[in-house]
Amino acid sequence: MILTELHLHHFRNYQDLTVHFNPGVNVLIGHNAQGKTNMLEAIYVLSLTKSHRTSNDHELINWQEKSALISGTVEKSIGKIPLELQFSSKGKKAKVNHLEQARLSQYVGQLNAILFAPEDLSLVKGSPALRRHFMDREFSQMSSKYLYNAGQYRTLLRQKNKYLKQLKYRQQTDRVLLGVLSDQLAAFGAEVIIARQHFLKHLEGWAADLHQEISLNKESLRLEYVNQLKVSDDTTVEEAYQALFKLYQDNEQREIEQGTTIYGPHRDDIRFLVNDKNVQAFGSQGQQRTTALSVKLAEIDLMKEQTGEYPLLLLDDVLSELDTIRQTHLLTAIQNKVQTFLTTTSLSDVARQLINEPTIFEIEHGTLNKEEVK
């Protein structure tokens, strides 16, 4: 898929802007605090309906205004599709083909995007919460069913945790409702767990090949899905549900005493193994970065495999965090394959040599100057 056009109205430091993009590489270049990352953020928000930088949508609206609009045209195999997102104090509205969507979940998946920012290099060595967020963010774009099940699980988890605290402090005494919540939570949790197992298995296949190539055949990469049920590729949703619900039943008193849900996919993790060694605990920084790069690049192929369309790739000042070898592999892998948006204060010599006919946008104080480079 290709984002051919983007329009911003009162978004961040952009008052009113329309820009047409190159189907290949688009370089957003400029000094810090000029609007490069804001532009990338707008594309990300148009894709996922939420920002990767803030959970407060009000921050997306220009401080002098009461509402903001992001719209664009995405070109897919089925044709061109207009997309629109409106933000105001009343909430968000999403439109596809000029038709307002009843729920935001119906909108997600129209424009798929993979973000690669410096913080993503911490995917390997960062917290389990970071890796769970990674799974939810990427897999939700590939499957509306996953998006729904993960959303239902989060809602029920909040409800159950609230009720557990009420039981802990004797504000409630009815355990029947707790059993109902646990049953529903186990049902949606099982769906999430089995879907994660499926997606990670496919992601591992793509990432392993890329890692071997980047490491010059010196290293092999494996991804292990760490979960309390110890599911395998053969585990069914029903089996996962029965196992998770039994954990809730067997540990009901313990959960009440702690006032929180102890088991479920909200406790899951991913383990990265390089040459059968846990790279999170024992790998060098270079191995950790190569692993993160392999996984992010593998997402591109996995999303194409699952949806039939290549996603957009958003590179937010990530080249400066990579050495020459990893820059080369990244830029070579995406060449003539996926529409790319790259922010930087200056292009490295490696990037200038490897990027084929980019469109460079010089950004200053929320304005763009476009220059074709042949």
Swiss-Prot record:
Give me the residues that bind ATP, please: 30-37
| Domain of life of the source | Bacteria
- Offer an example of a GO molecular function term for this protein: single-stranded DNA binding
Q: Does the keyword DNA repair apply?
A: yes
Family annotation (HAMAP family): RecF
General function of this protein: The RecF protein is involved in DNA metabolism; it is required for DNA replication and normal SOS inducibility. RecF binds preferentially to single-stranded, linear DNA. It also seems to bind ATP.
This protein is called DNA replication and repair protein RecF
The upper taxonomy is: Bacteria, Bacillati, Bacillota, Bacilli, Lactobacillales
* Gene, per the UniProt record: recF
